[in-house]
Amino acid sequence: MDQQIYSLQKKVEEHKEELIQLAKTLISYQTPAPPARNTEGIQSWIAGYLNELGFSIDKWDVYPGDPNVVGKLKGTDSADYYSLIINGHVDVAEVKEDEEWKHDPFHPIEKNGLLIGRGASDMKGGMACVLFAVKLIREASIELPGDLILQSVIGEEVGEAGTLECCKRGYHADFAIVADTSDMHIQGQGGVITGWIEIKSSQTFHDGTRRNMIHAGGGTFGASAIEKMAKIIAGLGELERHWSIMKSYPGFKPGTNTINPAVIEGGRHAAFIADECRLWITVHFYPNETHDQVAAEIEDYVNRLSDSDIWLRENRPVFKWGGSSMIEDRGEIFPALEVDPGHPGVLALTASHQKVKRECPIIDVSQSVTDGGWLYDAGIPCVIYGPGDLHNAHSVNEKVSIEQLVEYTKIILDFIISWCSRKKEQ
């Protein structure tokens, strides 16, 4: 088998133009999110590609115009051999009108050993590598004992959980790789959750009554919801500082766990005391925490702060956490993902990496978030491992090294065969 894998890896080199053309084809589909609802074309193409390779296809709309595609290659001995999910998203970062691209971002070019175009690094380059590796395996008539599941999902760029929908649909495996941007480091990640904190007064007052609320002898029990929200914002800053002192995680700089007061909305008219205010926050947390845990910590802190305020005791803050889409309901959740370096899947991926790169892979944490947290949250051991680096993801003239695409294809090819040909440990 090792000799057969080596022969296939040589084919990656010999046919790298086919790999590059495959990446160019994926990039040429204009799938920015926002605006989203534009992935039907690329997903139909991927479904057709996998169907021709013998995969059973499951394609369904998550949103109109945005379908998920899952291809499954049933193993010859699924019960006894390890199964694998490889996951990737086909939406890309938006391209704004004022961005100064040197060429059309959706007509990719090669220059100085780089592939340039929107999504080259994040993460259509990685998707192309996986598809090409699978094509070579199928053309070589290699039968995998374990199941191989490829997930091509939508919505990652805007917090739409295409991957969560795959989990809800019942897709599970012994190990998963998210082929997203990691510069070929094996990575875990912290998590992100957004939330709304709303204060609403039980009464509405005219602007002319403000003096009666804020001066001695005024006799009116009332307050501006905006000013009370300012008190909560200050309190969140105190909690954030407490976290930075008391919490830590290897690979993250102290204070990476943040509470960002991102958007504030409030009041109804300049002639009224603000009777409502809403604060939209973004919370970053560490890999060993859950989004439910940090949300509960924030609620507890804000509620205790409210207990110390006479008006807030009577007009309690209300919390709404997460959401299914930054587009649809202005909310998102990216669960954290913790890597176990001793897991058989991580050890096998390390071995595949070493065979090609002649060095151990770096195992660390991403400074961003991916859909990997949803797989981990569903009980699937998972890592982020893909070509491209975060400095290029979302950037003007986004690019990825062609050499890295070739290397990654060789590694993922070796890993698919090795892992899916390995008997489960009893």
UniProtKB/Swiss-Prot annotation:
* Binding positions (Zn(2+) 1): 89, 122, 180
Binding annotation for Zn(2+) 2: 122, 157, 394
Which keywords does this chain's UniProt record carry?
A: Cobalt, Coiled coil, Hydrolase, Metal-binding, Thiamine biosynthesis, Zinc
Q: Which residues cross the membrane?
A: none
Q: Which cofactor does it need?
A: Zn(2+); Co(2+)
UniProt-listed Pfam families? M20_dimer, Peptidase_M20
Residues annotated as catalytic: 91, 156
What does this chain do?
Catalyzes the deformylation of the formylaminopyrimidine N-formyl-4-amino-5-aminomethyl-2-methylpyrimidine (FAMP) to give the corresponding aminopyrimidine.
Provide the family line: Belongs to the peptidase M20A family.
Protein name, please?
A: N-formyl-4-amino-5-aminomethyl-2-methylpyrimidine deformylase
Native organism is Bacillus subtilis (strain 168)
Q: What is the lineage of its organism?
A: Bacteria, Bacillati, Bacillota, Bacilli, Bacillales
Per the record, the gene is ylmB
